Structure formats: C-alpha cells, structure tokens
Amino acid sequence: MEKTFNLTRRDDGIAILTMDVPGETMNTLKAQFGPEISEILAEIKSDPHIRGLVLISGKKDSFVAGADISMLDACKTAGDAKALSQQGHVVFNELEALKIPVVAAIHGACLGGGLELALACHQRVCSDDGKTMLGVPEVQLGLLPGGGGTQRLPRLVGITTALDMMLTGKQIRPKQALKMGLVNDVVPQTILLQTAVEMALAGKRAPKPIKKSLVNQVLEGTSFGRNIIFDQATKQVEKKTQGNYPAPAKIIDCVRQGIAKGMQKGLEVEASHFAELVVSKESEALRSIFFATTEMKKETGAEGATPRKVKKAVILGGGLMGGGIASVTTTKAKIPVRVKDISEKGLSNALAYAYKLLDKGVKRRHMTPAVRDNLMALMTTTTEYKGVKDADIVVEAVFEDLALKHQMVKDIERECGEHTIFASNTSSLPISQIAEAATRPENVIGLHYFSPVEKMPLVEVIAHAKTSPETIATTVAFARKQGKTPIVVQDGAGFYVNRILALYMNEAAQLLLEGQSVEHLDKALVKFGFPVGPITLLDEVGIDVGAKISPILDKELGERFKAPAAFDKLLGDDRKGRKNGKGFYQYGASSKKTKAVDETVYGVLGIKPSTNKDAKALAERCVVQMLNEAVRCLDEGIIASPRDGDIGAIFGIGFPPFLGGPFHYIDTLGAANLVKILEGYQSQFGNRFEPCERLKTMARENVSFF
C-alpha cells in the first residue's frame, strides 16, 4: 500500500513531512492514517538531528480539504464516532507536544480537519494565492470541528472570532487570516517552503497577542464578560436556526466548557458532542446533500454525450435576469459575453448591475480594481445583432411572451451558427412550445435561473423531446462554469421547482383568505425551516408574477393549480410587492429594520386577521402539497431521481436542508403517514389534497425512496 506521508531530512536539520494521498486530487484525512502518522512522529522524536518540522502538501492546489466525510457513514453508533474524534485528538496532541518547532506551510484549501491539523502545529504560514482559504465548515454538515478545533481556535484567535468562524463555516482569505492571528505570515507560493523552513530554524515563538477591540478585551478577559458572549451567541443561534439545527448550540457549549474547565475537559466535551451530531438525523440529511451535489458534479446530464466548449455567450435582454446571467458568465465562468437589448437603457442597466457586483469584491478587498476592470472588459453590448455570429450559446431572458420568444429563436437561427444553442430562461412556458419556431429544435433548451442570479445556486436545464444530448451536456457544463448547481428536468409547465412551489404558495394564500394573519403564516413556515415565509416570498418575487404563472399551470396541469382569488384582489389594488413598494408588507426608509405588515391588505382581501391555528398545522398544510407534487413530478419523469428532486427543492426554493429535501423528508415521515395526512385534508378541503398514485402504492408496499 502506497504511503500518504513522506518524511525527508534537510542538511540544516529541518525535516519536511509531505502529505499526498495517493490517487486523489485533494488531500483528506482518513482514520487509517493514524498509525502511519504516529510511526512518523515516533521516528522524529527518536532522531536528535531533527531541529524542526515543516508540514506541507504534495498536491498542487490543496493543503488538506478536511476529513473524509465518508468515514462518518461507517460509524454505526455514537461510540464509533466518539472513538474517531478521540483518535484525532491523540494524533494532534502528539504533534503539538513535539519539543521541536512544527510549522504548517499552507497553500490551497485548508479546511475542517485540515485547519485543525494546522492549529496543532506551533506556527502557520500560508501562500497569498486566491486558492488558499482557511476555515472550519463542519457546521454546514450539521457537525462541529471534532479534531480539537473548538479548543485550539478560540485560544489562538479569541472567542468571538472563533465562534464566528465555527458558527458560520465561513472561509478566510490569507490577508484576513494574518490580521486575525490565524497564521503567522503570508508569502508568495514560490517562497512558501523556504519561509516555513526559516520559521522552523528560528525556533518556537510565543504567539503574538491578538489585536482586540477594547470591548472584546473586557468581555473575553473576565468570566462575566465571557458569559455575555456565550449568552448572546446562543440567542442569535436560536433566532437563526429556529431550533432546527443542533450543531451551533453544541459548538458554543464546547468552547464555553473548554475555556472554563480547561483544554482536556474541552476535548472530552468536543468528542461527546461530535459523536451525538454524527448520528443525528439532521447531520445525516445534510451529509446526504453534500454527497448528492458531489456526485452530480461528475455527471454530464446526458449519458454518453460530450459537452462542446463554450468560448462565447450572448444574453438577450438587459433586465435584472439578463444582467445577472451576464455577470456570472463573466465573473465566474470567465467567458466573454455580448448583451443584446433593444434599448441603450437596458444595456446600461446590465453593465451597471455587473459593475456593482464586482465593485463589492473590490470594496471587500477580495479583488483589485484591475481584476474588476478586466472582468468588465469581457462584457460588451449591442442594440442590434452585431458581434453574435460566433456565439456558442445564446441565453434568452426577455418577457414571458411566446410570440416574442419565437421571434428570438428565428433571429438567432438567422444570425448565428448552426451549432449555436438557444437557451430560454423562461420560468413557465413549455420549451417545446418555444422550439416550435426553430428549424433546429435540437439546439433549443431551457435554462431556468432563479433570482437573484448571483446568489441562487440552482439552475434547471430543461430538455424537450427533440433536444440533443450534446446540447444538454454543453448547457450543463456551461451552468457549472457559472458556479451553478444544474439539475436536468424534462419539459412541462412550471418544470419542477415552480411546479412544487406553486401548490405550496397557493395553499398559503388559501390560509390567508381563511383569516390567518400574514405574520402568523410567515413565522410558521420559517419555524418549519424555510429561509422566508411564503407571503414574504410572494412580495419578493412579485404578486403579478405569481398571477401570470398560475393560469399557465392551471391550464396545463389541472384544477388543483387554480390560484385563490387573492391574486386578483391584490392586483386590483395595484399591489405587486416590493417592486412597486406595495404588497403585504410596508416598504420604504422607515421599514428597513423592522418589517411590518401593511394592515390595509386585510381590507382588500375582506378578512379579519387571526392567529387561531397552530403553527405546525399551518406549515403542514402547505408542505404536504409540495411533497405530493414532488412525487408526481418523479412519476411523470419531470425529474430523473429523488436525489435531483431533493437538490432542486433545497437549492431552488430553500426547502429546509436539515430535512434532506422533499424525498428524504417523505422517507422520514413514512409514505403511509403522509397518505393518511393528505387524505385527512382531502376530506376537509377537497381533491387538491388527493395523494398521487405512487404515494399510495408506496404506502401499501411499505417502501421508501432511499
């Protein structure tokens, strides 16, 4: 078996320990490395000629990306997981206890267990490269740093900074890491090893005192002040997680106990809490999402098809969506973009939108003005079809008007090459209808982005019956280069995400008309785990947008999609939501901090607001509609698998990640239980709650999706 760790000795007495996991592009920590590391440490301790040790990666752009997450699935009990954490503690404690200076030379990803390894070293130096990022993202998998991170990080950078890193999972850039005391130096990659060797030769040095604000000095320097920090962090966590995620509270407890009772006690608490989280249903769900997205990155979207390289893109429409799509194409994919709009104003807006996003990076010192300007230079504009002939893909982001989209298809087929892909960003019109205007329908596909484009990770790649496999594969690859998570769905009204969202939103509107208050409804679904409530979402998306989509779904998919009368009443009062400052909530300068309901909306709807229904019951009524429709989409072949359905719902509409997605959640509930709930509502409210056939079959046969 090939070794992962290689120890070499220099003439100056410094030993270099290189980590290079055989056959993998990135280093990850595995349980089986324990004996190998212990053997090397014993060798180092027994050699009096070794004056210092430098730990470095043999990978091109990765220090250590973290622990191998698949190890956790092998843990059948909390005891197994605890033993895993304790094994890490033993190795890292042994490294830290070496009498010679130990320096971590970091280039590339230094995350999770990788950062915990670096923290066990006496000093750290990292490259100034953009690929170098440091962090402890375990909380995003429903876990905590289980290799001593909850103890060493607060002692190095301070309690407040450490809690911020661990509770958010944020990744830190090199200069920021130096400023906060996480690393001792930042240098160009070309002299990284040399600098680390010089640090080791200089011997162990006491860490520099952390620069803290006066307030932080007072708070962190006394037990009374520290209690204030921990109590405040707990309140913020409870507000943010609504009690749905156990990891943040356990992270706070690890730090609290470690600071109060000492490092050894802190490590014991860390191992116990880590073990409990590993076997929790929340972490299992979050890890399933991680594995699903990792698996999807290896797929082309069309079996056996090879994607063509996209060297140039054209965006039709300079509005909010067009500007956003153009922006991610230049900034993320680094692909030249030509934006075409009928008006100079639309083009100016698209350029301004892209510049504003890039300038944020400059202001936050994530990029230089020169880099911003070079990326902006990739974007050019036109009011006519000039400079579009060599486009490999054209993304259409114009109004939801079929005749207009037909004209766009004809224009592109006339002006561009025979292999140019026409990708429509329609949110509701079937792609087959758009392709009716094409002489090359195999090049027509849907590419449905979500707003705001630069923030929302999902795109739906929609294939109609005649879309070629090569077109699908090329579009999927293009979306990935934009930093998106694409799921391939088949053609049909509403596709997948908007289809399952529509019934959820309709049910919320129905509950509103039954007299439930706006705040009560929104709070109920936020408590369930959604990032925002359905009424807030309706205001953000636009009440007029919802009203346009509903008739299309109603016509194509049937009576259950018929929108409640609320939409017509609201639009009759010119309420479109945030976009025109008039919706369910108040908008304006005074409403920025505390969002208040516009009480006049109740008069428009003809209701008296009430909070008389249980929050769990409200959430259940909305969510079961979404679950039922998700299974219908799977049954009809709209989505290829339960995995894709889970990813689409989580990344497209914020379905609670700790539940793992609609299909994982159905497995948790049990199909028989869900059918029973749906039939109960069907008897009360009618056939819109009728369970789909597949759910009934699953209930009878007692089967699950995973």
Curated annotation (Swiss-Prot):
Pfam families: 3HCDH (PF00725), 3HCDH_N (PF02737), ECH_1 (PF00378). GO terms for cellular component: cytoplasm. It catalyses: a (3S)-3-hydroxyacyl-CoA = a (2E)-enoyl-CoA + H2O; a 4-saturated-(3S)-3-hydroxyacyl-CoA = a (3E)-enoyl-CoA + H2O; a (3S)-3-hydroxyacyl-CoA + NAD(+) = a 3-oxoacyl-CoA + NADH + H(+); (3S)-3-hydroxybutanoyl-CoA = (3R)-3-hydroxybutanoyl-CoA. Keywords: Cytoplasm, Fatty acid metabolism, Isomerase, Lipid degradation, Lipid metabolism, Lyase, Multifunctional enzyme, NAD, Oxidoreductase. One of its GO terms (biological process) is fatty acid beta-oxidation. Residues 308-706 are annotated as: 3-hydroxyacyl-CoA dehydrogenase. Its main location: cytoplasm. It is found in: Cytoplasm. Residues 1-188 are annotated as: Enoyl-CoA hydratase. The record marks E116, E138 as: Important for catalytic activity. Pathway: Lipid metabolism; fatty acid beta-oxidation. Transmembrane segments: none annotated. Its EC number is 4.2.1.17, 5.1.2.3, 1.1.1.35. One of its GO terms (molecular function) is enoyl-CoA hydratase activity. Catalyzes the formation of a hydroxyacyl-CoA by addition of water on enoyl-CoA. Also exhibits 3-hydroxyacyl-CoA epimerase and 3-hydroxyacyl-CoA dehydrogenase activities. In the N-terminal section; belongs to the enoyl-CoA hydratase/isomerase family. Heterotetramer of two alpha chains (FadJ) and two beta chains (FadI). This is Fatty acid oxidation complex subunit alpha. It comes from Shewanella putrefaciens (strain CN-32 / ATCC BAA-453). The lineage of its organism: Bacteria, Pseudomonadati, Pseudomonadota, Gammaproteobacteria, Alteromonadales. The gene is fadJ.
